[in-house]
Curated annotation (Swiss-Prot):
Keywords: Cell inner membrane, Cell membrane, Ion channel, Ion transport, Membrane, Metal-binding, Sodium, Transmembrane, Transmembrane helix, Transport. InterPro entries: FluC (IPR003691). It comes from Bordetella bronchiseptica (strain ATCC BAA-588 / NCTC 13252 / RB50) (Alcaligenes bronchisepticus). Belongs to the fluoride channel Fluc/FEX (TC 1.A.43) family. It catalyses: fluoride(in) = fluoride(out). GO terms for biological process: cellular detoxification of fluoride. It is found in: Cell inner membrane. This is Fluoride-specific ion channel FluC. One of its GO terms (molecular function) is metal ion binding. It is a multi-pass membrane protein. Na(+) is not transported, but it plays an essential structural role and its presence is essential for fluoride channel function. The chain crosses the membrane at residues 2-22, 37-57, 65-85, 101-121.
Amino acid sequence: MLTFAPLNFLAIGVGATLGAWLRWVLGLRLNGAGWPWGTLTANLVGGYLIGVMVALIASHPEWPAWIRLAAVTGFLGGLTTFSTFSAETVDMLERGVYATAAAYAGASLAGSLAMTGLGLATVRLLLR
């Protein structure tokens, strides 16, 4: 059972801080005027890592809750961003670059799903 233990709060806070910081750095380094590469990168990397973490956590039920909370709820929650993706897509639509908006939305959704599957498959292959 998950509790409101101080360690759980700390784990989420530290993980979220690190994930949000990495997303900010990716945005600074990679986002351009025409295509938000930083946000896409954060979401694709986050998709892969959530697949990895889901598979690892499933294969290690003995791990304490704070590990999952730090990695998944904290770090990956801070790294990935559906709200920024949505705002960037709507901005593209408002600017009339419909093909770019559709490509970005498609790449973000399909790419994140594919990366999550790849993360799961990677761990399952390595644990054989």
